[in-house]
Amino acid sequence: MLNTLNDVLNNVDNFIWGMPLIILILFTGILLTVRLRGLQIRHLGKALHYVFHNEDDGEGEVTSFGALCTALSATIGTGNIVGCATAIVAGGPGALFWMWLAAFFGMATKYAEGMLAVKYRVIAEDGHTLGGPFYYIEKGMGKNFKWLAKLFCVFGTMVGLFGIGTFTQVNGITSAVNNFFDPSNVHTISLFGMNYSISVVVAGIIVTICAGLVIIGGIKRISKVSEVIVPFMAVTYIGVCLIIVFTHLPQVPAAFAEIVQSAFGLKAVAGGAIGAMTVAMQKGIARGIFSKIGRAHVRTPV
């Protein structure tokens, strides 16, 4: 059953992240970057300012810093570490180049998503702020496109349940725990006809309980928990990355050369150069979108 599920997910992944969608997403980012006159460069200082200066006043249920931490919580670690490693394994070092490209132009896309989410957000009867793609599709494009908003909601739920919304994070956590405590899978338990390492089961239960305790508190509790955990995650992640870079400075130029050569298939044989470049683009841009853009446009309105 597990192998069948993996095959289905792989087929869906290959279909969705085909070249047409890759080109559409990349050129959308380029178009928005041009129309916004390089927003990600012109307002970099302002963006960094709001990283270190919190705004408690204004509309919404959480502070600006809380919104930032909530947005980053879904990408730091799983997206940046697991996502990058997966992209390199699947597409080679060249995938990193396309990740950088997708991340740069994706900043403009992310800004546009956030702006639309805030512009078309609504206040529910209980006082909570609601917003996201399904709201700005319906309100921005008109009542005739309400079906598209519902379709987005359905597929978004499926992605959240069976894709990057839960599977990636939980798999990353449980795999790390299992590799530390029981890498040889000596201690196992049978569940639903499959054998699982006890450490994986225990880690899964703990993650479920902790996530449940946070989620039942609503967006305010999610924001408060993110404000505590995410800064530690970010500082640790950036610190470790800098340590690795500075302890391997002599290898940095060669690494950049390898990334560029692999990105354009320059090291591949003539017949496979286009194929190597295509794989690097697909894996790099897909993981770049996950690790840099995330899904914060749903949380932005609050």
Specify the residue positions occupied by each region the protein language model found:
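Membrane-interfacial loop-to-helix junctions in multi-pass transporters
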Residues: 17-21, 54-63, 93-94, 142-150, ...
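Select transmembrane alpha-helical segments in multipass membrane proteins
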Residues: 22-27, 63-71, 143-161, 203-206, ...
